[in-house]
Amino acid sequence: MTEENKEVLFRRAVPSEKAALQKLQIDVFSGEQGIPPEKVPVLPSLAPQYWCAVKGSVPIGAVAAWREEGKIHWGRFAVKKEYRGQHIGQELALYSLRDLFSQQVDTVYLGARDATVKLMEKWGGKVIGASSFFHGSAITPVILQRDDFWRAQG
């Protein structure tokens, strides 16, 4: 953890935090990227699991994982604008992926924007298809396998 993040707690979210985390995700994805708010939350029927970065009692970052069509997806990765550039997103991603892979998950799928693609490639992720455009920005399909992830961690 970096010196600037010592007051930030990274953890698995509790159910009572879901609404606040979804609001954060909607603010980022809808407010900044123009994605319709109704398309942002993961459907409850997919039983999403959430992780968060909190400062005090305020959520400043969120990410989710869910099972869809037999595959584990990781996404809705968001950090409040004023906390970007402090490695909070990177630490949240690492925390959530370590936790997810410790749950006997072998493979994670995601559709990612360029910055997240670079992060996932650094951790053993592989691009598995061509980018497509979603609400004006490129989304690239990426796969991250547990063994590759742990190997990249050293």
Residue spans of the language-model regions?
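Conserved active-site tyrosine of GNAT-family acetyltransferases
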Residues: 120-121, 125
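Conserved beta-strand in the GNAT
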Residues: 52, 58-66, 73-78
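Conserved acetyl-CoA-binding loop-helix of GNAT-fold acetyltransferases
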Residues: 79, 85-98
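Conserved catalytic-core motifs of GNAT/GCN5-like acyltransferases
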Residues: 111, 126-145
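Short loop/turn motifs at secondary-structure junctions and domain boundaries
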Residues: 41-47
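Short amphipathic alpha-helix that is part of the acyltransferase structural core
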Residues: 2-36, 50-55, 145-154
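Conserved GNAT acetyl-CoA-binding A-motif
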Residues: 100-113
